[in-house]
């Protein structure tokens, strides 16, 4: 079997196992979510407060709210305000209905809220990431060129005249060292013991 077909078969197997596992995870005690095109809930989050707005097709009759099949007391308006929303305690299936409603439309709500969160749209998030990457790359290039120049200057200072070629850099300005006095050349006009060859008669 070619490798491409093997990957397709493996993908189909994983997909079927995932769908089968998802069906098994449904709790039969929880209400099944039913949504129609006309029943659309509106959800707005501000800080730690979540506001649910009932669909418009229910009219202005007395609206009741329930969560996970239990009626919420003292909640009869078109909007349901959930202050200090907790993901663990307040998540679940919500429904709003009137006494004349034939069926209930459920909304599964699971949200994470925080006190000082700021909502950022997609373009702003992408711009922040791109700017961060560009600044980081620019900083890395500056460090690279600075370390490269520092290494080149240190190699130039350490190289001596015998390392091949003329001395460069600061060695160019220094005068050559004074010769050793033991090997100092004889000056003209100076007569020392060994300044010339004397012939002796035999």
UniProtKB/Swiss-Prot annotation:
Any Gene Ontology biological process: adaptive immune response
Q: Which PROSITE patterns match?
A: IG_LIKE (PS50835), ITAM_1 (PS51055)
Q: Which SUPFAM superfamilies match?
A: Immunoglobulin (SSF48726)
Q: Offer one Pfam family short name for this entry.
A: ITAM
Extracellular topology: which positions?
22-125
GO terms assigned for molecular function = transmembrane signaling receptor activity
Cysteine disulfide partners in this protein: 54-96
Enumerate the transmembrane spans. Answer: 126-146
Identify its membrane topology class: Single-pass type I membrane protein
Keyword annotations for this protein?
Adaptive immunity, Cell membrane, Disulfide bond, Immunity, Immunoglobulin domain, Membrane, Phosphoprotein, Receptor, Signal, Transmembrane, Transmembrane helix
The places in or outside the cell where this protein is found are: Cell membrane
- Annotated signal sequence is 1-21
Which InterPro entries does this one have? CD3_esu/gsu/dsu (IPR015484), Ig-like_dom (IPR007110), Ig-like_dom_sf (IPR036179), Ig-like_fold (IPR013783), Ig_sub2 (IPR003598), Phos_immunorcpt_sig_ITAM (IPR003110)
SMART domains referenced in this protein's UniProt entry, alphabetically: IGc2, ITAM
The record's region (NUMB-binding region) falls at: 170-187
Superkingdom: Eukaryota
Q: What does this protein do?
A: Part of the TCR-CD3 complex present on T-lymphocyte cell surface that plays an essential role in adaptive immune response. When antigen presenting cells (APCs) activate T-cell receptor (TCR), TCR-mediated signals are transmitted across the cell membrane by the CD3 chains CD3D, CD3E, CD3G and CD3Z. All CD3 chains contain immunoreceptor tyrosine-based activation motifs (ITAMs) in their cytoplasmic domain. Upon TCR engagement, these motifs become phosphorylated by Src family protein tyrosine kinases LCK and FYN, resulting in the activation of downstream signaling pathways.
Which protein is depicted? T-cell surface glycoprotein CD3 epsilon chain
The species this protein belongs to is Felis catus (Cat)
Kindly list the organism's lineage: Eukaryota, Metazoa, Chordata, Craniata, Vertebrata
**Gene this protein is translated from:** CD3E
């Amino acid at each position: 079997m070619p490798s491409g077909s093997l990957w397709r078969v493996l993908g189909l197997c994983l997909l079927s196992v995932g769908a089968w596992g998802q069906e098994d995870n449904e709790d039969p005690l929880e209400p099944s979510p039913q949504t129609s095109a006309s029943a659309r809930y509106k959800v707005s989050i501000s800080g730690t407060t979540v506001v649910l707005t009932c669909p418009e097709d229910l009219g202005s009759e007395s609206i009741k709210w329930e969560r996970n099949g239990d009626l919420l007391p003292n909640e009869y308006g078109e909007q349901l305000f959930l202050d200090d929303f907790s993901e663990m305690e307040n998540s679940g299936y919500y429904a709003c209905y009137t006494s004349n409603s034939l069926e209930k439309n459920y909304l599964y709500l699971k949200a994470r809220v925080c006190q000082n969160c700021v909502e950022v749209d997609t373009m702003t998030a992408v711009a922040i990431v791109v700017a961060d990457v560009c600044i980081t790359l620019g900083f890395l290039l500056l460090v690279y060129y600075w370390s490269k120049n520092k290494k080149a200057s240190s190699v130039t200072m350490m190289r001596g005249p015998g390392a091949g070629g003329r001395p460069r850099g600061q060695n160019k300005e220094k005068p050559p060292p004074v010769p050793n006095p033991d090997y100092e050349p004889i000056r003209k006009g100076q007569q020392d013991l060994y300044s010339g060859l004397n012939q002796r008669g035999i």
